[in-house]
Amino acid sequence: MDPALRASFLQQLQQVYTAMDAAYGQAAAAYGFACNGCEESCCHTRFHHHTLIEYLGLREGFNQLPADRQAEIRERSAAVAEQHAQDLATGADSKPMCPLNSAGRCGLYARRPMICRLHGIPHELHPPQRPPQLGPGCGEFHRRCGRTNYHAFDRTPLYGELARLEAECRQALGRRRKIRMTVAEMLLTDEVGE
């Protein structure tokens, strides 16, 4: 991909992420919810990410890390990917820690994918031609704020912006193949091909 075009897409992705962070922050503040000190860390959840643009953004951040830090994260990513494979084979759910997490902090916090930014708070989606979908929020949210009245957190415009950017990026790259990768897989895959 042309470096200027890539930079433009990644800059637009950061703008979408800024909007996500602001919307999440506003919803969290309405509840008085702070996402920290959690026993049920979402960093132990096996999220699958589906966008090429987020893969490119995560890899861009990863590639800017010092070589020794990259090697450390790759090693943890391989262990997590292996554990996920074992879990799939056995039906277990061991919940290994995200390979980017170090001492409770994300090593690529500014580049973390959408679901890492928006997880935890009750939300709604309004898909076209279908009834609204409501998401309940995480267990920790319900322990702390479960009796609080619902505050609208509509993810629809945020997903729409990410989908628009994804479509433009895929068109520019001529990529059609769907992506379904964990963070560990994204960090172990140097190039997502056709």
Residue ranges of each PLM-predicted region?
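Short loop/turn segments that flank or connect secondary-structure elements
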Residues: 1-41, 45-194
